[in-house]
Amino acid sequence: MIAGLNVITDNLDYLLWGRAATGEPGGVLLSLMMAAGAAVIALPGGIVLACLAWRFTGLVRKALFLWAELIRGIPLIFVIFWMWYLLPLMTGGDLPGALTVTLALAWFTAATVMHSVLAGLNALPSGQYEAALSQGFSSQQTLLRVLLPQALRNILPSLVGIFISLLKDTSLAFIVNVPELTTVAGQVNNRVQIYPAAIFIFTGVVYYLLCCSLEQLAKRWRITRPAL
């Protein structure tokens, strides 16, 4: 048991930061960086797509739903593979692995955010839209100033669940050897070749603590925010 803990403590810096001191972040730090980067892209992207789907009917909405269902129906690991091979062809050069995975996570998550935000908008009383229009608001002002803030607050638990899944999905970066937490845990296990249970139990505990922390932060934010 003590020896298993020694494996963790001896490699703790590498598991937490990777080689950040030499400009190559890894481990927990890189997992958080990829999750944060993907969230920064996916959240506003998903909101914009949801607003377009809510505002416009017909071909625009059908095209957005088709795109979202296509993305959600494909395993994320395939999206990562596609990005890994297609982005260099599109950009004419190799991209950093962490950036490629971040873009894949953002693309995948934006579709889920779109559906969640759209559900929140559709759940609001329809009379609010007519009431805002009668007060002189335009359709765009009504959506952005009246409906969207309420919808986002109402779907906060859903968004938290989405971003918890996003954080856990960063572990799939191991498939293209991006040195996030799961990858470096595997590297440590391959190097020491003993106590794999201790290494991967530690990895699981770290993911659990990160996800619980995110959930608690969201709860605290929801409690302290004034009601709309």
Where are these regions (language model features)?
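Transmembrane alpha-helices and adjacent helix-loop boundaries
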Residues: 1-228
